């Protein structure tokens, strides 16, 4: 069986591909039978870095229909669509966000439709589809009302996944991933990136800026849980999803003050002292539109996992990425 991971050269994509290679098989049909993975196509704007005979690294434009069509055929058992322009960039560059997040998603879905084999598609969505006047706790019955371009673009993707599934072109499911913390590597253009920066940089001996007040809460997931939940979304049967193909994934509601306390427990007072507050009104305005508490009973009943606490997330990062 062949798999396609779009956005596969990014941090989460590379972690996901490693997990798939280690597993060696995936159940993508409703009989629950696992099929051996023979090829994983890692597609992104730059080539992926994994060196494995089962991985084909391809660079290209996700919004180019011809390029995307060349990646998907009747042998493609599943597509996990991670390719996206992140929140801060999508807000700053409307045309780029629409091109990648909407046109690129449509190009992928059309390629699946033309393949004619109804592949399983996991669409990586976001809690940014919610905003405005929300209840204190959001569940799957709350109507999405995004207040930023990124959230709007992700919601359009969800609706397309619903309709392509309804028409029998794909077996789709959209998972609203919490903010993934801690991301290794360099800071990116995500408005939520500071939640990783204030942990990763101080643990590595570098200073970091917190652009929001310490009482700002966010819905958080570790990379390990995010990867596990993407795999579970890809392997769970259609019957588990029913008519609602969008799902709020489990996470932790944590304040930035709690994040800094966890940083100090793991890295000591010196690490905590490397973080300074310098509020950014644009980031504050966008982040405050996102909900920070969810009822994810449906997802947990379906077998999706949740992290224990923020300190465990920080300790896992410190273990996986020790200072050089």
Where does each model-flagged region fall?
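Conserved Rossmann-fold NAD(P)-dependent oxidoreductase catalytic core, especially the SDR/UDP-sugar
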Residues: 103-148
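Active-site Tyr-X1-5-Lys
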Residues: 132-134, 147-173
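Amphipathic terminal alpha-helices
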Residues: 277-279, 291-301, 308-324
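Glycine-rich NAD(P)-binding loop of the Rossmann-fold in SDR/ketoreductase-type enzymes
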Residues: 63, 92, 96-107, 144, ...
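Mid/C-terminal beta-alpha module of Rossmann-like enzyme folds, strongest
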Residues: 202, 213, 227-229, 233-287
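N-terminal Rossmann NAD(P)H-binding glycine-rich loop of SDR-like oxidoreductase domains
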Residues: 1-26
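NAD(P)H-binding glycine-rich loop region in Rossmannoid oxidoreductase-like domains
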Residues: 49, 59-100
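NAD(P)-dependent short-chain dehydrogenase/reductase
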Residues: 162-217, 223-225
């Amino acid at each position: 069986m062949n798999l396609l991971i779009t956005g596969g050269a990014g941090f989460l994509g590379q972690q996901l591909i490693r997990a798939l290679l280690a597993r060696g098989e995936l159940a993508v049909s409703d009989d629950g039978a696992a099929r051996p993975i023979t090829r994983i196509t890692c597609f992104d704007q730059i080539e992926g870095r994994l060196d494995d005979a089962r991985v084909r690294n391809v660079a290209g434009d996700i919004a180019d229909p011809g390029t995307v069509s060349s990646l998907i055929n009747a042998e493609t058992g599943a597509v996990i669509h991670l390719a996206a322009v992140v929140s801060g960039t999508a807000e700053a560059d409307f045309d780029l966000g629409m091109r990648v997040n909407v046109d690129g998603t449509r190009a992928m879905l059309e390629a699946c439709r033309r393949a004619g084999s109804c592949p399983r598609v996991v669409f990586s969505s976001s809690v940014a589809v919610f905003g405005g006047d929300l209840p204190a706790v959001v569940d799957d019955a709350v109507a999405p009302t995004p207040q930023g371009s990124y959230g709007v673009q992700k919601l359009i993707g969800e609706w397309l996944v619903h309709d392509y599934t309804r028409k029998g072109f794909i077996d789709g499911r959209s998972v609203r991933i919490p903010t993934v913390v801690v991301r290794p590597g360099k800071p990116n253009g995500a408005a939520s990136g500071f939640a990783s920066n204030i942990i990763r940089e101080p643990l590595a001996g570098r200073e970091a800026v917190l652009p929001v007040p310490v009482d700002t809460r966010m819905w958080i997931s570790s990379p390990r849980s995010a990867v596990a939940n993407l795999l579970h979304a890809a392997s769970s049967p259609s019957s588990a999803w029913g008519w609602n193909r969008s799902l709020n994934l489990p996470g932790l509601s944590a304040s930035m003050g709690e994040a800094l306390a966890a940083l100090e427990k793991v890295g000591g007072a010196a690490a905590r002292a490397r973080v300074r507050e310098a509020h950014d009104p644009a980031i504050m305005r966008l982040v405050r539109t996102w909900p920070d508490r969810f009822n994810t009973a449906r997802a947990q009943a379906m077998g999706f996992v949740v992290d224990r606490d923020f300190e465990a997330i920080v300790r896992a990062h410190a273990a996986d990425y020790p200072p050089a």
